Amino acid sequence: MNALAPLGMVSDLPSSNQVSDGTAVSKDYFVVKDGVKFAGTHLLVDLWGAHNLCDPDMIDRTLREAAETAGATILHSHFHHFSPNGGVSGVVVLAESHISIHTWPERDFAAVDIFMCGACDPYKSLPVLKAAFRPSSINLGEQRRGLIV
């Protein structure tokens, strides 16, 4: 039995690095950008003065749309709604990595991580987040993960 089955994180579809007979195909998903090779781009997105931070279903839809807009393949998502403040923590697991969020509605703040490898462009997710959460300001950081030196 697959170890992820109890968590509901098993896909019936072969991943993009498998052929239909179950034989793994070796493919390098590292990114080459500006002559530098690395695993993927990890964006750290702080949304201040943000709205819509208490609805896990809306946040799930938003992060799924952000992933699809970036060209990612969604495998699974899970969100938790906290009380009494109504904050939400959740993740959309991608074949190319993940998008996660933690919200603090009492501070009008959300912390979003977008980590993607391969041909996905995590920057394409940002307009989706801006439209859904309407932040008054955004702090954005980028980290190239798995940098080959």
Descriptions of predicted regions:
Residues 1-149:
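Polybasic/polar functional segments that serve as interface/processing modules
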